Amino acid sequence: MTAANQNYGTGRRKSSSARVFIKPGNGNITINQRSLDVYFGRETSRMVVRQPLELVELLDKLDLYITVKGGGISGQAGAIRHGITRALMEYDETLRPALRAAGFVTRDARRVERKKVGLHKARRRPQYSKR
């Protein structure tokens, strides 16, 4: 892939990190050398990945080459969406207000809360016995 006429965006969500390259094409989405439908079995994950492209109506005008690592399926889909959004803003800055209004520009900063000593999980307490 040549560096000319392509745009790049990095996306992160939970512990996942995605690198997204977009260039003019006919709508092919390649994730880790696999197609979108092969990589994500769940339709909800595929929908999350397509959201920014459908919003700006560029789904069938751009090819996407994506590498993603870390985390689970949901986190990876969110990281890819964030990366696509950043790459689209680099591609055309006039798309920023629409993407911002949809909430795609802001990085979701929620992380897994750590487990505390004396608790079963982050907030799950042992059962309380009155007597």
Curated annotation (Swiss-Prot):
Report a single Gene Ontology molecular function: RNA binding
Q: Which residues cross the membrane?
A: none
Disulfide bonding pattern of the chain: none
Q: One GO CC term of this entry?
A: cytosolic small ribosomal subunit
Record flagged with keyword Ribosomal protein: yes
- Alphabetically list the UniProt keywords: Ribonucleoprotein, Ribosomal protein
**Record GO biological process:** translation
Q: Does the keyword ATP-binding apply?
A: no
Recorded hits in Pfam families, A to Z, give: Ribosomal_S9
Going by the entry's taxonomy, the superkingdom of the source organism is recorded as Bacteria
Name used for this protein in its record: Small ribosomal subunit protein uS9
